[in-house]
Amino acid sequence: MFSHQDKVGAFYKNNARANSSKLSLVTDEVEERRSPWFLSILLILLVGILILLTITGIRFHQVVKSNLEFNKLLIEDMEKTEAVHHQVKDVLTPLFKIIGDEVGLRLPQKLNEIKQFIVQKTNFFNPNREFDFRELHWCINPPSKVKVNFTQYCEITEFKEATRSVANSILLLTLYRGRDDIFPPYKCRGATTSMGNVFPLAVSLSMSLISKPSEVINMLTAISEGIYGKTYLLVTDDTEENFETPEIRVFEIGFINRWLGDMPLFQTTNYRIISNNSNTKICTIAVGELALASLCTKESTILPNLGDEESQNSVLVVILGLFGATHMDQLEEVIPVAHPSIEKIHITNHRGFIKDSVATWMVPALALSEQGEQINCLSSACKRRTYPMCNQTSWEPFGDKRLPSYGRLTLSLDVSTDLSINVSVAQGPIIFNGDGMDYYEGTLLNSGWLTIPPKNGTILGLINQASKGDQFIVTPHILTFAPRESSTDCHLPIQTYQIQDDDVLLESNLVVLPTQSFEYVVATYDVSRSDHAIVYYVYDPARTVSYTYPFRLRTKGRPDILRIECFVWDGHLWCHQFYRFQLDATNSTSVVENLIRIRFSCDRLDP
């Protein structure tokens, strides 16, 4: 029998089979061809793993960084929250408790104590006296044990309300017209043309009072917020028929209304004639808030109330309402009250205004407390350089070396208080002209324009700012300069070196217009032309321009008074002018009162 091995050998012997050595070579070649591809795949996988690890590391770093920043902000917020909690707990909570105690417990107790105090004082001081309270609810429901003067107060209150209602409808259009700019706009590139006209007063109480044997000595006019007021001294020889005395003082008030198209009409609504009173020779005037106020005196120099009754000078106070209510019109003599350092005040033709129920005027005053500063100002300015004023030996209006200060007169028009004139003084630029100091309402709430007119053609006048409040301050504005030689707050008016101009016989007062921008007007009586003329000068300091217009006169003479008061109407300049002169031909005195209008236009406007 064959063994199993022999059978296998016999099988392979008789059958073909692959050579084992040749098969091994083929397998090695296949493995050699696969090795590079396998390595490439492994390399790619390795690179991918590295990239994934890198990205994972970067993201992990960003997350860690963000967590750190968030933790930092969270810690800061916790600190701030802790601080706020501390403030609320340790500061605000006790404060609220204190406020609650004050408001809830102590304040009602204090108010009750004050109420009891007022009631006790009211009952103690003349409980039967008639009180004149200024609020309407006192008329309707007066308190117990207090007697209210219904007849006086309620009539005044009702009349004022009715007057204000009627006047506002009339004056609204006037006030709108009175703020317009009179000059061409800034875009004007051509020549500015001016045209003037003269108009007689359509209706004038003064002209109706002046008869042939009568003469107006002086006239003072004030215009404010559509209201005008006038006062003048009328001298007449016709004492038997019309008046008891040769001299009478006339006051009139009214509003400016439209008449004949575009012409303003001075419509008189109330007037008063005072005769047989020597204290009305010199008067001031102020208008505003539907009223006229005036201070009248016999002499220009007034000695305020200094305690000596023999040296006191009383001032006649005249008040007129717009529509002539008897209880609003007042006539009373008052003694001015001033600080003991104020020695004298000088009252002439002064124009003021009424604001917040207070009439205010500016006058020269002689104050002992201000003399030192003014003398030092002038002395220091005259040490090294000779100004024209350094040669003066006497100063207006008090004479000698006594330099005047700026005085302010205030008169309260509140009917709940007695009439009183308070005098206060302030230091300002040196005053060369002691006549005609005026006060105009300014665009600022706490100040007005204080003007002093020019004089003799060499002093240009000056315009200052003067405060309205309790503290009286005068600040230089224009037409003044500060000398280099002076180290203190020293200002002098501009004074020319030239000799007095003989062609200018008289200068008027300085008028500040009620426009939004600062503009002012002055007039002169000029004889340089073949015909005499009143020449108007209109200034606009903001634009550094000025305009001149002469109004030729039909007569020739020597003037002694020239007074103007200007306002804006429909964008044009209107002025009420009054002048008195002595005719050369007949040597008689003549007075003229009329209106002038100056219109400014531009030849070419830029688009």
Curated annotation (Swiss-Prot):
GO biological process: symbiont entry into host cell; virion attachment to host cell
Glycosylation sites: N149, N276, N391, N422, N456, N587
GO cellular component assignments: host cell membrane; membrane; viral envelope; virion membrane
Subcellular location: Virion membrane; Host membrane
Membrane topology: Single-pass type II membrane protein
Residue stretches spanning the membrane: 39-55
Intravirion topology ranges: 1-38
Keyword Transmembrane helix: yes
GO molecular function annotations of the record: host cell surface receptor binding
Keyword entries, A-Z: Glycoprotein, Hemagglutinin, Host membrane, Host-virus interaction, Membrane, Signal-anchor, Transmembrane, Transmembrane helix, Viral attachment to host cell, Viral envelope protein, Virion, Virus entry into host cell
Annotated InterPro entries: Hemagglutn/HN (IPR000665), Sialidase_sf (IPR036278)
Pfam families in the cross-refs: HN
Entry annotated with the keyword Transmembrane: yes
Virion surface side: 56-607
Record's function text: Attaches the virus to cell receptors and thereby initiating infection. Binding of H protein to the receptor induces a conformational change that allows the F protein to trigger virion/cell membranes fusion.
Family to which this protein belongs: Belongs to the paramyxoviruses hemagglutinin-neuraminidase family. Non-sialidase subfamily.
Protein name according to UniProt: Hemagglutinin glycoprotein
Organism expressing this protein natively: Phocine distemper virus (PDV)
